[in-house]
């Protein structure tokens, strides 16, 4: 199982860490204070730096067809875009997260071959739009509604669009504030029967107050067996 420690001496890890730290809020290990807008990167520094290193190592220069469920400020999407060769960038979001409009529009503006589908990812109309695109994705991030029922619905519908060699990422697998994700990854029979966890990026260091939301997070990366 790949962990954060596998990358911490890596030059790329330090690069990603520095960029994430500059754009993430203090409660996530970053340097930003709240300014009334949600224009910050909603990622824990060490965890996401290790994730980007893993993805770069896995895909190298290969073209990536990426499906992102939940985008908020779109900064996670931008970090992945800047790190990989994204050929198709499909994003689902209901746009109900407040204060993200300026960051979302600004970040979307420079990404060719991006499709933003607005709506609830669990609704039939949205599912039909994704199906109509006809893509198979070799990278998929499930980071929308974190309630157990919604994570289950997102996974059990969209995993069928994952290619055989594709990677599936879950955010907040170790976050007590949103326990539905942890419950899902430990109990879902389809995930546990058909997928293997390749990477477990959970940060147990003490540089953050463990009562803060972003200090927990946790990122899990899975691949079909």
Where are the language model's segments positioned?
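N-terminal auxiliary segments of SAM/dcSAM-dependent transferases
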Residues: 1-17
């Amino acid at each position: 199982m790949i962990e954060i420690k596998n990358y911490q001496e890596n030059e790329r890890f330090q690069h990603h860490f520095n960029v994430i730290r500059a754009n993430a809020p203090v409660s996530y290990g970053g340097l930003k204070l709240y300014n009334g807008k949600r224009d910050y990167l909603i990622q824990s520094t060490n965890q996401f730096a290790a994730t980007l290193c893993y993805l770069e190592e896995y895909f190298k220069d290969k073209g990536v067809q990426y499906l992102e469920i939940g985008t908020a400020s779109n900064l996670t999407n931008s970090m992945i875009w800047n790190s990989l060769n994204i050929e198709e960038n499909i994003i689902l979001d209901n746009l109900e997260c407040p204060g993200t409009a300026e960051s979302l529009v600004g970040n979307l503006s420079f990404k060719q071959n991006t499709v933003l589908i607005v709506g609830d990812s669990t609704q039939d109309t949205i599912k039909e739009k994704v199906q109509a695109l006809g893509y198979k994705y070799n990278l998929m991030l499930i980071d929308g509604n974190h309630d157990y029922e919604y994570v289950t619905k997102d996974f059990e519908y969209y995993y069928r669009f994952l290619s055989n060699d594709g990677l599936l990422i879950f955010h907040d697998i170790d976050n007590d504030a949103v326990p539905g994700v942890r419950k899902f990854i430990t109990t879902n029979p389809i995930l546990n029967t058909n997928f293997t966890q390749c990477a477990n990026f959970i940060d147990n260091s003490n540089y953050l107050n463990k009562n803060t939301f972003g200090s927990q997070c946790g990122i899990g990366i899975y691949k079909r067996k």
